[in-house]
Design a protein with these regions (language model features):
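Membrane-interfacial segments
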Residues: 1, 24, 28, 32, ...
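Transmembrane alpha-helical segments and their short flanking loops
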Residues: 49, 77, 135-222
Length: 222
């Protein structure tokens, strides 16, 4: 009967999925997380600042595919077990998120379209302050393409600086934006926060300049 189905179907789903999650999906996630951690550390140790720059440049596409969630086991291991700091993913993510907002800001300042200007300012604040980049990406940067190119160029440059200065985060960032910058404070590396701020500023300036040059309002309106 339909009434029994509506009651039993969710119950049976839970009964089946809980053991499956603990016995199959959990170990698989742990296994993949371990190998992902190994790969990220290899990338950093082998390529150094180039690895951080590459991560920062492609981070928008990692976010769009939802793959950033796959890095949680790696981040938890780095920040809670060993070595208690993380030098590549979070620096790249924060720089990338801020630069998505800066690209949208450049469009807002350059365009004469009132609606686009309003959207640019609001999505820029959302990305820079809250670390939520989807509005900026989908409403502006991906839509007009050149702002995304500008953000990727700026993020690569900012990531390069962060890698060269060996910046690292010391706690898990809830919002990957300017709000997370205090998490770069370190007693062992007194200049770590300053170096991250420099990296963010360099990336932001490069993003703004690249977007300003590449984005053509006339071409975008065609």
């Amino acid at each position: 009967p339909e009434i029994l189905r509506s009651v039993l179907e969710p119950l049976l789903t839970i009964i089946v999925m809980i053991p499956l999650a603990y016995c199959v999906l959990g170990p698989i996630g742990s296994f993949l997380g371990t190998y992902l951690s190994t790969f990220v550390l290899w990338l950093y140790n082998t390529l150094g600042f180039i690895g951080v720059a590459a991560f920062a440049a492609v981070m928008p596409f990692v976010i769009m595919t939802g793959m950033h969630g796959a890095f949680v086991p790696y981040l938890m291991q780095m920040l809670t077990v060993d070595p208690l700091y993380e030098p590549i993913f979070f620096p790249a993510l924060i720089i990338s998120n801020i630069d998505q907002g800066i690209a949208a800001l450049a469009v807002a300042l350059k365009t004469k379209d009132a609606n686009l200007k309003s959207t640019g300012f609001s999505t820029a604040v959302t990305a820079v302050v809250a670390g939520v980049t989807e509005p900026a990406m989908y409403a502006i940067n991906l839509k007009y393409k050149t702002p995304m190119y500008g953000a990727m160029i700026g993020s690569a440059i900012g990531g390069c600086v962060a890698g060269l200065l060996k910046t690292a985060i010391y706690a898990f960032a809830g919002a990957s934006s300017v709000i997370a910058l205090p998490l770069f404070v370190s007693a062992d590396k007194p200049n770590n926060l300053l170096f991250m701020v420099i990296s963010v500023l360099v990336g932001a300036v490069a993003t703004f300049a690249a977007t300003w040059v590449l984005y053509k309002p006339e071409a975008a309106n065609k």
